[in-house]
Amino acid sequence: MFQSLIAIDYGKARIGIASGQMITKTATPIGTVETYDGVPNWIELDKIIKRWNPSDIIIGLPLDTQNFETDITKSAKDFAKEVQQRYQRKVHLINEAYSTREARWRLEEVKSKKVSHIKVDALAACVILETWMSEN
């Protein structure tokens, strides 16, 4: 059974991270980890995984609006394989279409004074996790 979960919004500049619980079906933004040319700061990601100890990791798969792969899809799939091997957790890929748009909309709704990339990326990870939890 799923315990705690981590969701990742993969990107070439940074990855957004959120945590969640299946029992409550809630997700909370944790923050971001910088990436360098698509390679994450593994030391920072290691710390997050160790701290939250998720049973499963959900990674957003960047597809276009017609569910076709994009330039970044292969990088996200490679990243997901590395995460699975590195942390020995079950990794689930989910279409992340519109997660960033939804995150921006949520921040605007709460009248966030500063819509930063960090907030958007972490909140996009929440959207990814909430979507996955609602489907599972």
Swiss-Prot record:
SMART domains: YqgFc
InterPro entries: RNaseH-like_sf (IPR012337), YqgF (IPR005227), YqgF/RNaseH-like_dom (IPR006641), YqgF/RNaseH-like_dom_sf (IPR037027)
GO terms for biological process, alphabetical: rRNA 5'-end processing
Keyword vocabulary terms for this entry: Cytoplasm, Hydrolase, Nuclease, Ribosome biogenesis
Gene3D superfamilies, per database record: YqgF/RNase H-like domain
UniProt cross-references to CDD domains, sorted A to Z: YqgF (cd16964)
The EC number(s) this enzyme carries: 3.1.-.-
Locations listed in the record: Cytoplasm
Organism domain of life: Bacteria
HAMAP family: Nuclease_YqgF
Function in brief: Could be a nuclease involved in processing of the 5'-end of pre-16S rRNA.
Family (UniProt): Belongs to the YqgF nuclease family.
The name this protein goes by in its record: Putative pre-16S rRNA nuclease
Source organism: Francisella tularensis subsp. tularensis (strain WY96-3418)
Lineage, broadest ranks: Bacteria, Pseudomonadati, Pseudomonadota, Gammaproteobacteria, Thiotrichales
